[in-house]
Design a protein with these regions (language model features):
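Preference for intrinsically disordered or flexible, low-complexity segments
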Residues: 3-308
Length: 308
């Protein structure tokens, strides 16, 4: 059955009149990116005055928070202090890199917590704050669990991962991410980019399970100046079967060489079968080869992808 409407921006068939969700998100993103400084200040002020509405997921405060954080990196210590005073501990991202006095308030609340639900939220907040004292607190709680630990599924070190880091049993910090972020943006036909995601670059080899074409799903050239922060002096290529990758018993492992070469390791289907059907159509393979996204020219805030 054909749908009655189409998106006026991209032509996607729809069951309703108006923009599709992708174009709607893009429209909202561009509007938020165009905020003037005085608009940002006004939205910060409104968030401070109505901080409880953020916890209740009420708009405009909820949408404003994510756009202030994701597009402008504009969650101020004042907002964080007001959130702490009001005991607003969700979303935890509000405490990202909060100042020491806010961190101490979070630690006090965590050490005073009686229930696992409250402790879970507070450890997430402390993970977002993320300094050495925050780590020391989570490490101590891992070594000497409180009664509420019985109501949680994972240790404090797993909560630290929410903030982009963790630690081992000896208390050594382990970074899980980078402090630099570039977006993938729509490029033009044939435009070169040091990063390609889902490009479906043509390969001669086929999948041993379904017989479908293998694809280079990610190609990343670490020699590009924008990607120097990765410390990769060469080209990373990741290859998989787009049909079977979701049906494997474990991860789809590769070994790459810095000249762009890749070796695909043997894999096993989740049900132990030797063969299966290929569920990727020729049209879908073609769409992979026409992916238009390229690496953006300038860095963006770390939470850029969370704002939409």
């Amino acid at each position: 059955m054909s749908l009655k409407y189409t998106c006026p921006s991209c032509g996607t068939p729809l069951g309703y009149e108006g923009l599709c969700w992708k174009c709607k998100c893009e429209q909202e993103r561009q509007a938020a990116l165009a905020w003037m400084p005085e608009q940002i200040v006004e939205k910060q002020r409104n968030l401070i005055q109505n901080i409880q509405r953020l916890a209740d997921m009420e708009d405009p405060e909820f949408a404003d928070f994510w756009q202030l954080l994701g597009y402008h990196d504009a969650i101020t210590p004042e907002i964080q202090r007001v959130a702490l005073a009001a005991e607003v501990f969700w979303p935890c991202e509000i405490y990202y890199h909060a100042p020491a006095d806010v961190r101490d308030g979070l630690i006090h609340a965590l050490l005073s917590a009686e229930y696992s639900s409250a402790a879970s939220n507070l450890m997430s907040c402390l993970a977002m704050q993320g300094d050495d004292k925050a780590m020391e607190t989570l490490l101590e709680l891992g070594r000497n669990p409180r009664p509420w630990r019985k109501g949680l599924y994972v240790d404090p070190s797993s909560y630290a991962q929410i903030g982009g880091w963790t630690f081992d049993k000896e208390g050594q910090r382990i970074r899980l991410g980078f402090d630099t972020c570039y977006p993938m943006v729509k490029g033009t036909t044939g435009e070169k980019s040091p990063v390609r995601i889902g490009i479906g670059r043509a390969r001669e080899d086929t999948c041993p399970h379904c017989g479908g074409r293998m694809v280079d799903i990610l190609v990343l050239d670490g020699r590009d100046e924008r990607l120097k922060f990765l410390g990769l002096d060469g080209i990373l290529t990741a290859t998989c079967c787009p049909s079977c990758v979701g049906f494997l018993k474990g991860p789809a492992f590769n070994r790459f060489t810095l000249d762009g070469g890749v070796e695909v390791f043997p894999s096993e289907l989740f049900d132990g079968a030797e063969k299966t059907d290929c569920y990727v159509s020729p049209e879908e393979y073609k769409a992979l080869t026409e992916n238009p996204f390229v690496l953006g020219k300038t860095p963006v805030p770390l939470f850029y992808g969370a704002a939409c």
